[in-house]
A protein has these predicted regions:
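Base-recognition residues in the alpha-helical recognition helix of bacterial helix-turn-helix
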Residues: 18, 42-46
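Short helix-coil-helix linker/hinge
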Residues: 7-12
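Pre-recognition alpha-helix immediately N-terminal to the DNA-recognition helix
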Residues: 3, 14-15
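Short, intrinsically disordered or compositionally biased N-terminal tails of bacterial proteins
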Residues: 1-4, 106
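Short, Lys/Arg-rich nucleic-acid/phosphate-binding segment
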Residues: 58-64
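C-terminal regulatory/oligomerization modules of transcriptional regulators
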Residues: 19-33, 38, 50-55, 70-106
């Protein structure tokens, strides 16, 4: 999981994952969307692939990349307790603000 965190810390790699979230794409589509060079996109894809976050398949002349969700699920599971913590704190803040509004009206 630590490797996945290190890999997704880079903004272009997160953007690549975002672009691949809904559908597999060839490198050219990623280059166009990111506005960075093809070698740079390929380097990021290699890092993502080495970390197990994306996989590639060949379709005729094209190499299509897609997200592998399994490593991201590990991150999601690790983050779950923190989501509950923040959800509770935000709920507490909302209650406090509602009480302040009620006190001002009284």
């Amino acid at each position: 999981m630590a490797v996945a965190f290190e890999v997704v810390a880079e903004p272009n790699r997160r953007r690549i994952l975002d672009l691949l979230r809904d559908a597999e794409r060839p490198v050219g589509d990623l280059v166009d969307a990111l506005a960075i060079s093809q070698p740079a996109v390929s380097k990021h894809l290699r890092v993502l692939r080495d970390a197990g976050l994306v996989e590639v398949r060949t379709d005729a002349q094209r190499r299509l990349y897609r997200v592998r969700p399994e490593p991201l699920r590990d991150i999601d599971e690790w983050l779950q307790p923190y989501r509950r913590l923040w959800s509770k704190r935000l709920d507490d803040l909302e209650r406090h603000l509602d009480e302040m509004v009620e006190e001002e009206r009284s």
